Regions:
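Alpha-helical transmembrane segments of multi-pass membrane proteins
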Residues: 103-118, 142-168, 182-201, 222, ...
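Short helical (or helix-break) motifs at transmembrane helix termini and adjacent helical loops
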Residues: 127-136, 417-432
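Hydrophobic transmembrane alpha-helices of multi-pass small-molecule transporters
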Residues: 1-71, 197-199, 210-211, 227-339, ...
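Helix-coil boundary and interhelical linker segments in multi-pass alpha-helical membrane proteins
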Residues: 396-408, 465-470
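Membrane-core helix-loop-helix motifs of multi-pass transport proteins
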Residues: 136-231, 248-256, 430-462, 467-470
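Structural signature of hydrophobic alpha-helical transmembrane segments
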Residues: 1-8, 290-296, 355-366, 415-423
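Membrane-embedded alpha-helical segments and adjacent helix-loop junctions characteristic
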Residues: 45-148, 310-402
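Generic transmembrane alpha-helix motif of multi-pass integral membrane proteins
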Residues: 11-22, 373-378, 397-399, 434
Length: 470
């Protein structure tokens, strides 16, 4: 059955509500209900019933189920690492290295490298990198605006470029919700990484800024202020959030409790990918590898906690479930996104939009348009996950229908979504970067804005060019 114009009403309504309410859950929920109403012919009660069952149907996909389970396990892993002193142990080791840092440039580069090492979570990266680097950044008179800029740029953007964590499950899940076959999701994701220009520029552009001291506009003023007056913030600004952000573990610092589980996670993922791919990791079973990696990593940290007498068996199980609970909001967005994606497929929204825009919009401009729309939505809502959940089910089906490179459009969607996480003043990583470095939020947004706009502009041009080439 063809739904015509009505097939675009639910996704458009979802986008508008996300922009107005800043609440992705409510927006997706209303989008799911509206989609079900359109599919059943407009009967509200039937639509409500169908919307309920659409959530159940989401679990018929093994890929969706594995993704959600893996995400919860990642939450348990990170939580137990923190509670067992793993993060504190790693922090202690890094602090011992600060005696080797003698210059501002060295401090900036060390902060960048530390952000690269912490790749499992954008929030965790902000917390660890910001708190570890702050003492020597402050001692060497690095303005808090510069510290926050580096900490922020190496958090979520790097997690997306190096997704050996819960991000692997999330990004692959968004691809499948957009119509990419489950057995091809990991391959498409890997091919999209070199095409995620915004994240590449954000991470390595920040390295260039650190190496060569490229200070633009407000950042130049911040550097001059720190150099001339010794003040790391504008008068009366900065530092207020630091104590709230820090919640260190009471356990004895144990770096092993971070390095061993993370090593098991990475090694298991690579091993299962190689085995299931018959020697070729890119052809391996990505979702199964992530699930096994998470299971063995969680098992490893649980054994360490019990062996070190930090928790009893019952206590470590309770702590594990507490950790899973920390990931429920993100898992909820994933579930809602998967469900919305299934309904949008049933509405055939992608093919309808393709038929409408074919005569008006060159298919080659789809990657650039996808990037731009995701930028705007993520900046307004402050959420990359929510933007990916909403826009993947719109942009990817159009790419499939138009015959446009799916990795290129996926890179555009993911990069545009990360722009908001990176640039928006209401993003959680923006707040956390400022909290751990002691920077005022508005000062951080103002000083990094010239850089992120340059990165975004270059990315947009590349998507326009490659849209015609690929």
């Amino acid at each position: 059955m063809q739904y015509g114009f009505w097939s675009v009403v639910p996704p458009i309504l979802t986008i508008v509500l996300a922009l107005v309410t800043k609440n992705v859950f409510i927006s997706l929920l209303i989008g799911i209900f509206t989609s079900s109403m359109v599919l059943c012919g407009g009967a509200p009660l039937t639509g409500l019933n169908d919307a309920f069952y659409s959530f159940i149907h989401t679990f018929e996909s093994s890929g969706n189920t594995i993704t959600l389970i893996s995400f919860l396990l990642i939450g348990a892993l990170i939580y137990l690492i923190e509670k067992s002193g793993g993060v504190e142990g790693f922090t202690e080791v890094m602090l011992k290295k600060r005696a080797l840092i003698k210059t501002k440039r060295g401090a900036n580069i060390f902060t960048w490298l530390l952000g690269i090492i912490i790749f499992t979570s954008g929030s965790l990266s902000c917390m660890v990198t910001g708190s570890v680097s702050r003492p020597f950044n402050d001692a060497l008179k690095v303005p808090h605006e510069k510290s926050a800029f580096i900490v922020h740029a190496t958090s979520t953007p790097w997690c997306v470029l190096f997704p050996l964590s819960g991000w692997l499950a999330a990004l692959a899940g968004y691809l499948t919700s957009g119509g990419v076959p489950e057995n091809e999701a990991i391959s498409v994701l890997l091919r999209s990484i070199p095409l995620n220009f915004y994240c590449i520029l954000a991470v390595f552009g920040t390295l260039a800024v650190s190496l060569f001291g490229i200070n633009i506009g407000p950042m130049r003023k911040a550097e001059d202020r720190a150099e001339k007056t010794g003040s790391l913030d504008n008068p009366g600004r900065g530092g207020a959030l630091t104590d709230e952000a820090m919640s260190p573990s009471k356990a004895k610092p144990r770096v092993l409790n971070m390095l061993l589980p993370m090593g098991v996670l990475i090694a298991t993922i690579l091993a299962v990918l190689t085995i299931t791919g018959k020697g070729n990791p890119t052809q391996g079973a990505g979702m199964q590898s992530l699930l096994w990696g998470c299971i063995l990593a969680v098992l490893t940290i649980c054994i360490l906690c019990v062996a070190q007498k930090l928790f009893s068996v019952d206590e470590v199980i309770n702590e594990m479930f507490k950790g899973m609970g920390t990931m429920l909001p993100v898992a909820g967005i994933l579930l809602f996104g998967f469900t919305m994606g299934n309904l949008v497929k049933d509405l055939d929204t992608g093919n309808y939009l393709t038929s409408v825009f074919m005569g008006v919009l060159s298919p080659a401009l789809l990657p650039a348009l996808s990037f731009l729309l995701c930028m705007l939505l993520s900046f307004a809502t402050g959420t990359s996950m929510g933007t990916m959940a909403i826009m993947s089910v719109i942009c990817l089906p159009m790419a499939i229908s138009m015959g446009i490179s799916i990795p290129l459009v996926a890179g555009a969607v993911f990069g545009g979504a990360i722009f908001g996480d990176h640039a928006s003043p209401i993003s959680d990583t923006t707040i956390m970067s400022c909290a751990t470095t002691g920077c005022d939020i508005i000062d951080h947004v103002k000083t990094q804005m010239p850089y992120v706009l340059i990165f975004a502009a270059i990315s947009l041009v590349l998507y326009v060019v490659l849209g015609f080439v690929m």
